[in-house]
């Protein structure tokens, strides 16, 4: 029984180290989302901080369209980060499923 507990503790520590490494990698990550066939692009960090917005000047005359495309590009980048985060955190936890509603990073 003690051997099993010690082994579980080692696995938990390794998983914690893997999660820390994955979180550090995600913090350095930059992802670009786009909309309108590339007329708008938004670059976010892994922490979803906006780094850059590029807008094709031809859409600036239509404010509503520009606003919609900026929001869509932001959402595209955000979804890409979510997918990358899920993939990296899944690898870090060795595929161990988290309870429903629990998200990483904690």
Swiss-Prot record:
Assembly mode: Homodimer.
Record has Cytoplasm as a keyword: yes
Locations listed in the record: Cytoplasm, Nucleoid
Record-given protein name: Nucleoid-associated protein XCV1128
HAMAP family documented for this protein: DNA_YbaB_EbfC (MF_00274)
Keywords associated with the record: Cytoplasm, DNA-binding
Protein's job: Binds to DNA and alters its conformation. May be involved in regulation of gene expression, nucleoid organization and DNA protection.
Entry similarity comment: Belongs to the YbaB/EbfC family.
InterPro entries on file: YbaB-like_sf, YbaB/EbfC
Key word Cytoplasm present: yes
One Pfam family cited in the UniProt record for this chain: YbaB_DNA_bd
Disulfide cross-links: none
UniProt source species: Xanthomonas euvesicatoria pv. vesicatoria (strain 85-10)
Gene Ontology cellular component list: bacterial nucleoid; cytosol
Domain of life of the source: Bacteria
Molecular function GO terms recorded: DNA binding
Stretches for region Disordered: 81-106
